Regions:
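Class I SAM-dependent transferase core
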Residues: 1-78, 86-90, 94, 107-117, ...
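Conserved nucleotide-cofactor-binding alpha/beta core module
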Residues: 70-187
């Protein structure tokens, strides 16, 4: 029996307390963000391959990261690692204006088609090096990174985080939450174990 939206939300509800996040997960059609041959499994609580060595993140991880970021309507959000566009879609559904950076032009193009099919607006897609963020639209109220940094948070992403902002990034196999307080100081906290594809510097090879 194929997984269903209702079963996924019931499973997530055991771990996620923010009803806005649960509603966003329920409302964004995940099947539009996976390859056609994976659509039967779209509502499974698992990561799925999307091509190019990349994956669409497990819904529980997406929900956990969104909950940590505390996205308010109208927030300016940097999303690093667009992939199929699913993470950006959830952030936009929470009311954010999203700038999403992807190093692979083919993935970014597919994400644009996926977002359009889902009727998701307020997402600007950028092809570039995600470790550098997107300075023209900075500072951001939240930064979401859907790929794992090897040793540390890229400095450019910290520089682009607004006062009062929150950044979530996997570093190795740990999820790290960084907050910038009203005085500009940074505070780091461990937010649990995760597994992500690596965050790679520079453009994708031709």
């Amino acid at each position: 029996m194929a997984p269903t939206r209702e079963r996924l939300i019931a499973e997530l509800r055991r771990h996620v307390r923010d009803d806005r996040v649960l509603a966003a997960i329920a409302e964004v059609p995940r099947e539009l963000f996976v390859p056609p041959e994976r659509r039967r499994s779209a509502w499974a609580n698992e990561a799925l391959p999307i091509g190019g060595g990349q994956t669409i993140s497990q819904p529980l991880v997406v929900a956990h990261m969104a909950e940590l970021l505390r996205i308010a309507p109208g927030a300016r959000v940097l999303d690093v690692g667009t992939g199929s566009g699913y993470h950006a879609a959830i952030l936009a559904r929470l009311g954010a204006r999203v700038w999403s950076v992807e190093r692979d032009p083919a993935l970014s193009e597919q994400a644009a088609a996926n977002l359009a099919a889902a009727g998701i607006e307020d997402v600007e897609l950028i092809v570039g090096d995600g470790t550098l963020g997107h300075a023209p639209a900075a500072p951001y109220d939240a930064v979401n990174v859907a790929a794992s940094a090897r040793r540390e948070v890229p400095p450019a992403l910290l520089d682009q985080l607004a006062r009062g902002g929150r950044l979530v990034i996997p570093v190795g196999e740990r999820l790290v939450l960084v907050g910038r307080d009203a005085e500009g100081r940074l505070h780091h906290a461990d937010a649990g174990g995760v597994r992500f594809v690596p965050l790679v510097e520079g453009p994708a090879p031709d």
